[in-house]
Regions:
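A short, N-terminal "cap"/entry segment at the start of jelly-roll beta-barrel domains
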Residues: 1-29, 33, 109
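Structural motif
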Residues: 31, 60-62, 69, 85, ...
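Conserved short histidine dyad/triad with adjacent acidic residue
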Residues: 33-47
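Glycine- and acidic-residue-biased ligand/ion/polar-headgroup-sensing regions
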Residues: 50-61, 66
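A cytosolic small-molecule/anion-sensing beta-strand core signal
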Residues: 57-58, 73-74, 92
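Short acidic-glycine-tyrosine-enriched beta hairpin
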Residues: 67-82
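Ligand-binding loop in jelly-roll beta-barrel domains
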Residues: 82-106
């Protein structure tokens, strides 16, 4: 079976809110999300079974992870263990990549 190559420019941008949009690629056990957050965008407190790595390519995010405030800036990576409550706010217009393992099945089920 050939190894699939995904092109971000061929993946539809999914509008989550007026302030947040994303593109998703999935494998068998992991998911990669390209996420765009406008300054002031809020990701509410939540937790999931997936381990998460967030790599900020441009901008900055303020996270609250299990009660600890963490600022993640361009070029930095945040690891969030599975099951850990967290929320985020975009301090600037932000472009970031999220890796989830296992796949966030709840994201695939969304309309």
């Amino acid at each position: 079976m050939p190894t699939p190559v995904h092109r971000w420019d061929e993946i539809a941008l999914e509008k989550i809110t007026e302030m947040i949009s994303r593109k998703i690629v999935t494998g068998d056990r992991e998911m990669l999300a390209q996420t765009y957050l406008k300054r002031g965008a809020q990701v509410p407190m939540h937790a999931h079974d997936s381990e998460q790595m967030t790599y900020v390519l441009q901008g900055a995010l303020r996270f609250l992870v299990d009660g600890e405030e963490i600022i993640v800036k361009e070029g930095e990576v945040l690891h969030i263990p599975s099951g850990t409550p967290h929320q985020a706010e975009a301090l600037e217009d932000t472009f970031e990549l999220d890796v989830f393992s296992p796949i966030r099945a709840d994201w695939l089920a969304e309309p």
